C-alpha cells in the first residue's frame, strides 16, 4: 500500500495549486451556462442531453454523452454554487484516486518494488494530465479513468479466481458495471473491455497470436472463451445502446474544429490522420509545448508525401510494429501447454508463466524480496513467478496506449478536434507502463553498477522534470487570460480571439480590439471573431465599422443569428427601418439545425423578434407587433429572460385598449423579474388609468426605490402627480428628473413642460 499512498499523495500535492484557479475555457459552457446544473431543471434531463446541455438527438448536438460527469457537476453546483474551488477539489481528489488505482494495477504486473513505485510516480506527475485535472471539464476523462481501472482490476480478480464460480462471476459483474460507468463518464471508457480481453489472452494465458483460435476452441479453455464472448457481447451492447441513444447519427463539426476531416484531398486527409498519433505520442514523450486548444491550424495539414513530417509517421509505426512483434514473438513460450504455463513441474496457480532465472534475479531491486525463507524456499521466488514477463507487459501496455485512443483517431468517425490533451489521460497509463518496463529491461540488461545507477537516476530525474512541468503548467490554468496567452504560439487565431474576450471583460478596450485583429490576421474568416470585433465597435459607438464586421461575420456564417440581431438594431437606430425589418425577419427564419449552440441561437432569434415587434410598435402597427411578440414567446428557450418581452406585450394591448390582457402581461413581466423597472412604470400607468390610484402610486415609488438614479422613473411619477393635480410635487419630480438625465432630450423637454404648468396656473 505504500507505493499507492505515496503516488496518490504526489498526484494530490502537484495539483494543490489549481484549487485557487477560476473557471476556464470550456468550463463556461459546460458549467456556468449549462441549464442542466440548475435546481429548477429536472435532474432527468441530464440523461437526455449531451455534455453541454443540448438535446442529444438534436442535429447540432456534440453527441458527447457523459451523464455521470454532468451529475457530479450538478452536485457541485448544489453544494457550492459557482464557486470554482469545490469543482477543482473534486478533480484533484479524483486524480489522486486514479493514481492510486493505477499504481495498484502496476503492482499486478511489476510486483511490489521500485518499478511499480516508478510507474505510479510517473503517472501522478505527467504534465499531459494538466488539462484533464486543472480544467474542470476534464473531470470526464479522470472519472472515466477511475472506473476504467476499477473494471480492469475486477477482471484481474475474475481471472485469478476462475474455478470458484460465485466469486469469479461476481468479479466479472463488477467488470461490466464499472465499464458501463466508465463509458457514462466518457465514451472511451468502454474500451476497457477490449483491454481486459488483451490481459486475459496475452498476460494471464500468455498465448501467441497463432495459438489464440486453437486454444479457445479446446474444452479445457471454455472459461477463456466464455469470458471473451461475454466481454464482446457486453461491449457491443453498450456501444449499440450508446449509438441508439444519440439518434444513430454521428456529430457534425465545423471546418475549424478538424480541418483534415473537411479537406477535399484524400491524400491530405490520409497523411494527416496517420501523422496525428505520432504528434500525440510526442506530447507524451516530451510535453514541453502544451495548449488549451489544438484546433484550426495548430497542426498544419500534410498535403504531400514530400512533407518531412511523414518521416515521423514512418518511424512511429515502424517502432510500434517492432514493439508488438517483440512482445508477441517470445521464445520462452515454446513450453506452454494450452495457454497454461508450467513451473517446477506444476501448473501456475494463477496461469501466469514462469520467467528465466536471470529475469527473476534482476527484475526487482528491493532486498526485502529475498528476505523471508520458509521450508527452505524463498517467498520472493514464489511471488516473482506469478508476475508476467516483460513481453506480456509490453503487449498490455501497447493495448492500454492504443485501444483507448482509437476513438480519437478519426478511424470510425470524424472527431471535433485535431489534438486534445485530456483525451490522452487514459492512454498515458500505457505510456507510463511502457517507459517503466523499458527502464526495467535496460536495468536488467546492463551489468556494470554505474550503468544500473544511471538508469535509476535517469528515471528519477524524468519524474522530477515531469513534476516541475506539471506545477508550472498548472499556473497557466489559474485564469483565462494566462491560459490564452500561453496558447498563442500553438494556436494564435483561437488564443488571440479568446484573449480579446477576456480583455474586453476587463474594460481594456484598445487591447481587446488589437487581440481581435490579431486573431483575424491569422484566420480572417472566423465568424465569431468578426462578430466579437463588431460588437466591441458597436459598444463604442463606431457603428459604421461595426456594421462592416457584422456583414463579414454573416458572410462567413450565414446562420449567425446574433450578427443579424445587432445589425438590425444599428439600422433601426439609424432610422433605416425597412432594412432593419428585413434583417430581423431573415434572422427569425434561420433554423437551429446543425448548430453547436442551439440555445444561444434561439435566444438571438427571440431577441430579433422582440426588436421587430418594437419596430412595429413604434410605427403604430400594434396588431403586427402582437403577432411578432407571440411568435417570440413560442420560440424563446428556457434561459431567455422574458420580462421585457412580456412588458411590451402589455404595452401593445394597452394601446389597443385591451386593458385586462395588458394587465395580465404586466403581471407576467413582474413575475419573471420582480425588480423589472419598466414593468413597474407601465403597470402603474395602467392602474392609474383604471382608477386604482393608490396602487399606481406604490408602483411608481417602487420603481424609484429600485433605481434612484434613473430620471425616467421620476418623470413617470411626476406625470402621475400632475394628473392628480399635485402640482408642487409634480414640479419637484420633474426637476429631479431633469437633473439626473440632463442629456436626455425627452426627459428635459417633459420636465420643462411640467414645470411650466404651475406657472401658467
Residue ranges and their predicted role:
Residues 1-575, 592, 604-606, 611, ...:
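Polytopic membrane enzymes that build or remodel cell-surface glycoconjugates and lipids
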Residues 489, 520-521, 552-555, 586-589, ...:
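Conserved structural position within tetratricopeptide repeats
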Residues 491, 525, 559, 597-600, ...:
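Structural signature of alpha-solenoid helical repeat junctions
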Residues 584-592, 731-745, 756, 761:
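TPR/TPR-like (Sel1-like) alpha-helical repeat modules
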Amino acid at each position: 500500500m505504500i507505493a499507492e499512498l505515496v503516488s496518490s499523495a504526489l498526484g494530490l500535492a502537484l495539483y494543490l495549486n489549481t484549487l485557487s484557479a477560476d473557471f476556464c475555457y470550456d468550463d463556461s459552457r459546460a458549467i456556468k451556462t449549462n441549464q442542466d446544473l440548475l435546481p429548477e431543471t429536472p435532474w432527468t434531463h441530464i440523461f437526455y442531453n449531451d455534455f453541454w446541455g443540448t438535446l442529444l438527438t438534436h442535429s447540432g448536438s456534440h453527441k458527447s454523452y457523459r451523464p455521470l460527469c454532468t451529475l457530479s457537476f450538478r452536485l457541485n453546483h448544489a453544494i457550492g454554487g459557482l464557486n470554482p474551488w469545490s469543482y477543482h477539489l473534486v478533480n484533484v481528489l479524483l486524480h489522486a484516486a486514479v493514481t492510486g488505482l493505477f499504481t495498484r494495477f502496476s503492482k499486478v504486473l511489476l510486483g511490489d518494488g521500485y518499478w511499480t513505485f516508478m510507474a505510479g510516480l510517473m503517472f501522478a506527475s505527467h504534465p499531459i494530465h494538466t488539462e484533464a485535472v486543472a480544467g474542470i471539464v476534464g473531470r470526464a476523462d479522470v472519472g472515466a479513468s477511475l472506473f476504467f481501472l476499477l473494471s480492469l482490476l475486477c477482471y484481474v480478480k475474475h481471472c485469478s479466481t476462475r474455478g470458484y464460480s460465485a466469486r469469479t462471476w461476481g468479479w466479472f459483474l463488477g467488470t461490466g458495471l464499472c465499464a458501463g460507468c466508465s463509458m457514462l463518464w466518457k465514451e472511451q471508457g468502454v474500451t476497457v473491455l477490449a483491454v481486459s480481453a488483451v490481459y486475459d489472452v496475452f498476460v494471464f494465458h500468455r498465448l501467441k497470436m497463432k495459438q489464440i483460435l486453437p486454444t479457445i476452441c479446446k474444452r479445457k479453455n471454455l472459461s477463456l472463451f466464455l469470458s471473451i464472448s461475454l466481454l464482446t457481447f457486453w461491449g457491443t451492447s453498450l456501444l449499440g445502446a450508446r449509438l441508439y441513444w444519440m439518434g444513430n447519427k454521428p456529430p457534425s463539426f465545423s471546418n475549424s474544429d478538424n480541418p483534415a476531416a473537411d479537406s477535399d484531398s484524400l491524400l491530405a486527409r490520409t497523411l494527416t490522420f496517420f501523422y496525428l498519433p505520432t504528434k500525440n505520442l510526442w506530447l507524451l514523450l516530451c510535453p514541453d509545448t502544451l495548449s488549451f486548444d489544438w484546433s484550426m491550424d495548430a497542426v498544419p495539414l500534410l498535403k504531400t508525401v514530400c512533407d518531412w513530417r511523414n518521416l515521423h509517421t514512418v518511424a512511429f509505426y515502424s517502432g510500434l510494429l517492432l514493439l508488438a512483434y517483440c512482445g508477441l514473438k517470445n521464445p520462452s513460450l515454446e513450453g506452454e501447454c494450452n495457454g497454461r504455463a508450467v513451473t517446477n513441474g506444476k501448473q501456475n496457480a494463477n496461469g501466469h508463466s514462469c520467467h528465466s532465472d536471470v529475469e527473476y534475479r534482476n527484475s526487482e531491486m528491493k532486498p526485502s524480496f529475498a528476505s523471508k525463507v520458509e521450508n527452505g524456499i524463498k517467498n520472493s521466488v514464489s511471488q516473482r513467478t506469478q508476475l508476467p514477463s516483460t513481453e506480456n507487459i509490453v503487449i498490455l501496455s501497447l493495448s492500454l496506449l492504443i485501444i483507448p485512443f482509437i476513438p480519437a483517431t478519426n478511424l470510425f468517425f470524424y472527431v471535433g478536434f485535431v489534438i486534445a490533451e485530456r483525451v490522452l489521460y487514459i492512454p498515458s497509463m500505457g505510456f507510463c507502463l511502457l517507459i517503466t518496463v523499458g527502464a526495467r529491461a535496460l536495468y536488467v540488461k546492463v551489468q556494470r553498477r554505474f550503468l544500473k545507477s544511471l538508469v535509476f537516476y535517469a528515471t528519477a530525474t524524468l519524474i522530477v522534470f515531469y513534476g516541475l512541468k506539471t506545477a508550472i503548467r498548472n499556473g497557466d490554468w489559474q485564469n483565462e487570460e494566462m491560459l490564452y496567452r500561453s496558447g498563442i504560439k500553438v494556436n494564435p487565431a483561437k488564443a488571440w480571439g479568446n484573449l480579446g474576450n477576456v480583455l474586453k471583460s476587463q474594460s481594456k478596450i484598445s487591447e481587446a480590439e488589437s487581440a481581435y485583429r490579431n486573431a483575424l490576421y491569422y484566420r480572417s474568416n472566423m465568424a465569431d471573431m468578426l462578430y466579437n470585433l463588431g460588437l466591441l465597435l458597436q459598444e463604442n459607438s463606431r457603428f459604421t465599422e461595426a456594421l462592416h464586421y457584422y456583414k463579414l461575420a454573416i458572410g462567413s456564417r450565414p446562420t449567425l443569428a446574433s450578427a443579424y440581431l445587432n445589425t438590425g438594431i444599428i439600422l433601426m437606430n439609424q432610422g433605416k427601418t425597412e432594412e432593419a425589418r428585413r434583417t430581423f425577419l431573415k434572422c427569425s427564419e434561420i433554423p437551429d439545425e446543425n448548430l453547436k449552440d442551439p440555445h444561444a441561437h434561439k435566444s438571438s432569434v427571440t431577441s430579433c423578434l422582440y426588436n421587430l415587434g418594437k419596430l412595429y410598435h413604434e410605427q403604430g402597427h400594434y396588431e403586427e407587433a402582437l403577432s411578432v411578440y407571440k411568435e417570440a414567446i413560442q420560440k424563446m428557450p428556457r434561459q431567455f429572460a422574458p420580462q421585457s418581452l412580456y412588458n411590451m406585450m402589455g404595452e401593445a394591448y394597452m394601446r389597443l385598449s385591451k386593458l385586462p390582457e395588458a394587465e395580465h402581461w404586466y403581471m407576467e413581466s413582474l413575475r419573471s423579474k420582480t425588480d423589472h423597472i419598466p414593468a413597474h412604470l407601465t403597470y402603474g400607468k395602467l392602474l392609474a388609468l383604471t382608477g386604482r390610484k393608490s396602487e399606481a402610486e406604490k408602483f411608481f415609488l417602487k420603481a424609484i426605490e429600485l433605481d434612484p438614479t434613473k430620471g425616467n422613473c421620476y418623470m413617470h411619477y411626476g406625470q402621475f402627480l400632475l394628473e392628480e393635480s399635485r402640482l408642487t410635487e409634480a414640479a419637484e419630480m420633474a426637476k429631479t428628473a431633469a437633473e439626473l438625465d440632463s442629456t436626455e432630450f425627452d426627459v428635459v423637454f417633459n420636465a420643462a413642460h411640467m414645470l411650466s404648468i404651475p406657472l401658467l396656473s
